[in-house]
């Protein structure tokens, strides 16, 4: 019996893609031997730990680049949340300033990631068959071998990553909300991000460096530690969270965008938070909205509409913004007329 070859076969990555595998090791009379060895990297030139730091940065600029091309060549004007001229008119930070601040944020998060990685264990393999054999012995026979195999090899990772999603959402909601409730924190830190009233993709991580460290870098670092993510699981969590954050700030409500279909916390939802009328609402980010719903901090302007439909459409949101602008102009017109009338009365006296 070649235990080493069995361990290697059962733990090999391609099996997840439907290649034939045998679960016979789960029915050995004795538990398969443990043959610990360092887990090979996905890329021969780079460790998985380094890849977990590089992949989110590459994903950030790749996805931002796609949206920038769409923006520059006007490829999806129908789905643009705000007219293109508003980007220059309403935003207080230049694109170059935003670009440099995001580069700084990436440098900081990479350095912090390297520090975290220094204290992480060396991830090993060669114990998986032994662990699954024990599970097979303890679990009812009605549970198929394949369920144990794929549940152990991939299901547990999915649960850990989902737990990471929940922690990141919790961390960011309460810290983000605190930044708005405390005037000092808002003035010194969070106000930088709100210099972009009309968000765009590569401005997603445009923050004061201190806020960027606390909100994004430290939050995901703690999530990684508490959920005991391996380097490969970190790659998924960090990269997915990064792409979701970019998509939330992209400035478009694209109908086939998977992020905007999978999550209620989408580009329109977050755009409301960047507007003056919604700045004290919609704190939840980047995945779910349950904290906003629980604490009633979600924007109520779409409450009736959301009862009828699962998500806010781009047309409805544009209509809403136009109505607010007309109301604002009408109020200003009435205010000026009232002042003029008061001045006339004073002159007559």
UniProtKB/Swiss-Prot annotation:
Single annotated GO MF: sphingolipid delta-4 desaturase activity
Alphabetically ordered keywords of this record: Endoplasmic reticulum, Lipid biosynthesis, Lipid metabolism, Membrane, Oxidoreductase, Transmembrane, Transmembrane helix
A Pfam family this chain is assigned to: FA_hydroxylase
InterPro entries: Fatty_acid_hydroxylase, Sterol_Desaturase_Related
Highest taxon in the source lineage: Eukaryota
Pathway of action: Membrane lipid metabolism; sphingolipid biosynthesis
Magnesium among keywords: no
Membrane association type: Multi-pass membrane protein
Catalytic activity, as annotated: sphinganine + 2 Fe(II)-[cytochrome b5] + O2 + 2 H(+) = (4R)-hydroxysphinganine + 2 Fe(III)-[cytochrome b5] + H2O; an N-acylsphinganine + 2 Fe(II)-[cytochrome b5] + O2 + 2 H(+) = an N-acyl-(4R)-4-hydroxysphinganine + 2 Fe(III)-[cytochrome b5] + H2O; an N-acyleicosasphinganine + 2 Fe(II)-[cytochrome b5] + O2 + 2 H(+) = N-acyl-4-hydroxyeicosasphinganine + 2 Fe(III)-[cytochrome b5] + H2O
Chain ranges passing through the membrane: 9-29, 50-70, 99-119, 148-168, 209-229
Gene Ontology BP term (one): sphingolipid biosynthetic process
Positions of the Fatty acid hydroxylase domain: 162-297
Changes seen on gene knockout: Phytosphingosine (PHS) absent from cell, with an increase in dihydrosphingosine (DHS). Leads to abnormal cellular complex sphingolipid levels. Simultaneous knockout of SVF1 leads to a growth defect.
Family in the record: Belongs to the sterol desaturase family.
Entry function: Catalyzes the conversion of sphinganine to phytosphingosine in sphingolipid biosynthesis. Involved in the response to syringomycin.
Extra information: Present with 54300 molecules/cell in log phase SD medium.
Protein name: Sphingolipid C4-hydroxylase SUR2
Lineage: Eukaryota, Fungi, Dikarya, Ascomycota, Saccharomycotina
Gene: SUR2
């Amino acid at each position: 019996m070649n235990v080493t070859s069995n361990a290697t076969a059962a733990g090999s990555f391609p099996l997840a893609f439907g290649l034939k595998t045998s679960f016979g090791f789960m029915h050995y009379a004795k538990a398969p031997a443990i043959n610990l060895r360092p887990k090979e990297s996905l890329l021969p030139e780079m460790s998985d730990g380094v890849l977990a730091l590089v992949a989110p940065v590459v994903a950030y600029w790749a996805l931002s680049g796609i949206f920038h091309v769409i923006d520059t060549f006007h490829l999806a004007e129908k789905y643009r949340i705000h007219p293109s001229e508003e980007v220059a008119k309403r935003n207080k930070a230049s694109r170059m300033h935003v670009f440099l601040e995001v580069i700084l944020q990436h440098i900081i998060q990479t350095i912090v990631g390297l520090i975290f990685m220094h204290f992480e264990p060396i991830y090993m393999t060669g114990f998986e068959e032994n662990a699954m054999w024990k599970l097979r012995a303890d679990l009812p026979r009605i549970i198929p071998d394949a369920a144990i195999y794929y549940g152990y090899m991939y299901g547990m990772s999915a649960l850990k990553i989902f737990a990471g999603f929940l922690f990141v959402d919790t961390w960011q909601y309460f810290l983000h909300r605190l930044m708005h409730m405390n005037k000092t924190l808002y003035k010194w830190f969070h106000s930088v991000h709100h210099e972009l009233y009309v968000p765009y993709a590569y401005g997603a991580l445009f923050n004061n460096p201190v806020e960027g460290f606390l909100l994004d870098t430290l939050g995901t670092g703690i999530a990684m530690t508490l959920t005991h993510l391996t380097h490969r699981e970190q790659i998924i969590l960090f990269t997915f969270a990064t792409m979701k954050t970019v998509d939330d700030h992209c400035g478009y409500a694209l109908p086939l965008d998977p992020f905007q279909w999978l999550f209620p916390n989408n580009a329109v939802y977050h755009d409301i938070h960047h507007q003056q009328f919604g700045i004290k609402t919609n704190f939840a980010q980047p995945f779910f909205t349950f904290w906003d719903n629980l604490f009633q901090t979600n924007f109520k302007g779409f409450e009736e509409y959301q009862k009828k439909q699962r998500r806010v459409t781009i047309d409805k949101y544009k209509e809403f913004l136009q109505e607010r602008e007309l109301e604002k102009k009408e109020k200003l017109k009435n205010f000026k007329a009232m002042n003029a009338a008061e001045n006339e009365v004073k002159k007559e006296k």
